[in-house]
């Protein structure tokens, strides 16, 4: 059944969040701060390992880099477009709207937790690749694995950052179902190279999310999102 993978992913995020809420109320503030740093380290390593998979190759027994030009152009042009549109502002507005609608207007951490968790779970290689596989073949195994990882990570995030991270299931559902639908409709454009490049830059953005978890406010990750689409488009130009 096409789209089932995202439904499972959403369910696991909600389950992990509820566990985080249950345990979080018994944690001291120092432990919550430490868990937030741990979340950042985990996300950093996930992003780094994903990017290295596409950046480094072994040729004739030696380690070489691949695709640096595509990565540089995608990140620079994507950042310029993102800053002009100011996606960070609009995602913050959406986060504030969700906060108000869910009765959490008094929670100062809600929007930051919502944005951070949403970006962590939507721009990664597993989400993109898994949604495309779901759309093309109905295979949801990658999204099932992603859901398990998301559930563990969101449990830590909710424990340390609050319930805003729980509602990340909304953009996760919207984004992954859209990718699944697009993959089902535009299958010829979903070439292996396009998917690899999209996943490559997406992993770099995951790394940036980890930086923001450890050093909040240093990177406006949402304004870098156009880089993902630039990477896919450049596949057919470079």
What are the residue ranges of the model-derived segments?
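Helix-loop-helix junctions within the multi-pass membrane cores of secondary transporters/permeases
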Residues: 99, 108-185
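Structural signature of hydrophobic alpha-helical transmembrane segments
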Residues: 2-15, 66-73, 131, 135-147, ...
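Interfacial loop-to-transmembrane junctions
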Residues: 210-229
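Alpha-helical transmembrane segments in multi-pass membrane proteins
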Residues: 8-16, 20, 24, 40-41, ...
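Cytoplasmic-side transmembrane-helix entry/capping segments in multi-pass membrane proteins
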Residues: 31-41, 96, 165-175, 222-228
